[in-house]
A protein has these predicted regions:
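Short glycine/serine/threonine-rich phosphate/pyrophosphate-binding segments
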Residues: 1, 51, 55-59, 81-82, ...
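N-terminal Rossmann-like dinucleotide-binding module
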Residues: 1-28
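Short active-site oxyanion
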Residues: 10-13, 46, 94-96
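Receiver (REC) domain switch-region micro-motif
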Residues: 14, 48, 185
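Beta-loop-alpha module in the N-terminal Rossmann-like domain of NAD(P)-dependent dehydrogenases
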Residues: 33-66, 78-79
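Active-site-lining helix/loop region of Rossmann-like oxidoreductase modules
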Residues: 102-186
Length: 186
């Protein structure tokens, strides 16, 4: 959508851990842009949109925040794993915006959190192949092959879930951040 034109916004560059993938993506765009390092993107842009895996969240966040820029991220798990992000953003007059995407009603949860919420429980369902390689699956020797019905593979807090399934629980992390906290959200 941004490539098609949005008033006041321009897609100017991308960063990627895999240059060949980024180059292939560039061929789909209407407007030519540059492939840059994370540092270069953060330096040249006013708003950095992060859709990268959690493993590079801290690098992207630090590069953006240290320059007092705006970071829009989908990585609730990355925010939970880097608790100093909010403090750093305040100190540098930067902003961190968690794009909540798949979680309808998050504004209602935020509003309710101004009052009293006694408990928040979230049930997440994922296809087994989406969980392959997740730390919790590997560490607990959970076999995903042959699963053909709903099976509980994890119970815990949103914070624990973010560590156990860093690529799969950004929605739960966002719910925890918006509501009663990542440690109390189940």
């Amino acid at each position: 959508a941004l490539d098609d034109g949005m008033d006041g916004l321009q897609l100017s560059s991308i960063a990627s851990g895999r240059r060949e993938k980024a180059e292939a993506f560039l061929t789909t765009l209407n407007t030519p842009i540059e492939i840059m390092s994370i540092e270069e993107v953060a330096e040249s842009c006013e708003i950095v949109v992060d859709c990268a895996p959690k493993v590079v969240f801290a690098e992207i966040a630090n590069a953006t925040i240290s320059r007092g820029k705006i970071l829009v991220t989908v990585s609730g798990a990355g925010i939970l794993a880097n608790p100093d992000i909010e403090k750093q953003a305040v100190e540098k007059k930067a902003r961190v915006i968690l794009a909540t995407g798949a979680l309808l009603g998050l504004d209602a949860v935020r509003a309710a959190a101004e009052g009293t919420i006694n408990s928040v429980k979230m049930v997440t369902r994922k296809p087994p192949n989406a969980l392959q390689g997740a730390p919790h699956i590997v560490e607990n020797n959970i076999t995903l092959e042959g699963l053909n019905g709903a099976t509980c593979v994890f119970k815990g807090s949103a914070r624990e879930g973010a560590a156990a399934f860093p690529a799969n629980v950004n929605v739960a992390a966002a719910l925890g951040l918006a509501g009663i906290g990542a440690d109390l959200t189940q």
